[in-house]
């Protein structure tokens, strides 16, 4: 059996049915003795260009190990399902189980959005502390000069 990476773009109006569709595709793979190594639901994303006047799609990533017959059945299911806008199947040398770059970038983006608010608050308090210290230094200088 070979390893494959499968990306499926599903019509955004069918987003509620994505779990059932994924279950159907994974059962197709497992029925032939295959295995699903990784499943990622990337959610609804903007397309680079419109497909059939649709500007968004629901993205799903699967890394599977299956036979050629199971892969053929899977691609046939994609082809005849009207909800599937596009599908891409790439043959891999080994099973990939780690997080994809898109999921990692999405998590880092969420973390970055949370961090600046805290950092800005720290910068504001540091600026206030510095201005207080400068005022104290100015008073000390004036006292030394006898003003």
Swiss-Prot record:
Keywords: Ribonucleoprotein, Ribosomal protein, RNA-binding, rRNA-binding. GO terms for cellular component: cytosolic small ribosomal subunit. Residues 107-147 are annotated as: Disordered. SUPFAM superfamilies: Ribosomal protein S6 (SSF54995). GO terms for biological process: translation. Residues 125-147 have a biased composition (Acidic residues). GO terms for molecular function: small ribosomal subunit rRNA binding; structural constituent of ribosome. CDD domains: bS6. It comes from the Bacteria. Binds together with bS18 to 16S ribosomal RNA. Belongs to the bacterial ribosomal protein bS6 family. This is Small ribosomal subunit protein bS6. It comes from Cellvibrio japonicus (strain Ueda107) (Pseudomonas fluorescens subsp. cellulosa). The gene is rpsF.
């Amino acid at each position: 059996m070979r390893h494959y990476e499968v990306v499926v773009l599903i019509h955004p109006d069918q987003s509620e049915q994505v779990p059932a569709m994924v279950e159907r595709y994974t059962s197709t793979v497992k029925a032939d003795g295959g295995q699903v190594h990784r499943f990622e639901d990337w959610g609804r994303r903007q397309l680079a260009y419109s497909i059939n006047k649709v500007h968004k799609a629901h993205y799903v990533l699967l890394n599977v190990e299956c036979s050629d017959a199971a892969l053929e059945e899977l691609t046939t299911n994609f082809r005849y399902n009207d909800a599937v806008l596009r599908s891409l199947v790439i043959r891999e040398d080994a099973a990939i189980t780690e997080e994809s770059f898109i999921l990692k970038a999405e998590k880092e983006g969420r973390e970055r959005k949370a961090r600046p608010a805290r950092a800005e608050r720290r910068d504001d308090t540091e600026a206030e502390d510095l201005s207080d210290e400068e005022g104290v230094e100015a008073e000390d200088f004036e006292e030394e000069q006898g003003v």
